[in-house]
Amino acid sequence: MIALDAFAASVTTDQPPAGSSPALQALWWARRGDWARAHECVQAHEGEPDCDSVHAHLHREEGDLSNAGYWYRRAGRPVSQQSLEAEWTALATELLGPSR
């Protein structure tokens, strides 16, 4: 799989890296500033823990904290106390990890 720095830098291209999971695609679109497209990616995969985690991040990013809390619970995670940037990095690192 691609390294975190290469994944983050790939937002200058037209599409997420080939083989990216829906959750990674959502993070990629979010990094590009296309919240709606990112949301579509995760919404299409509700119930998948990785997508639910990114879904929570997206609603936190938009400032809808009650909706974010719902998605954190669905993902089985506590509400993040990290900055949005740190949470994006943590999620991307986890999703890009060698165990995936």
Model-derived features with residue positions:
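Inward-facing hydrophobic residues that define packing positions of alpha-helical scaffold repeats
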Residues: 8, 23, 35, 42-43, ...
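TPR/TPR-like (Sel1-like) alpha-helical repeat modules
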Residues: 47, 60-82
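Solenoid-repeat scaffolds in large eukaryotic assemblies
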Residues: 37-38, 68
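Solenoid-like repeat scaffolds
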Residues: 9-16, 40-49, 76-80
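Terminal, low-structured helical/coil segments at or just beyond the last alpha-helical repeat
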Residues: 84-100
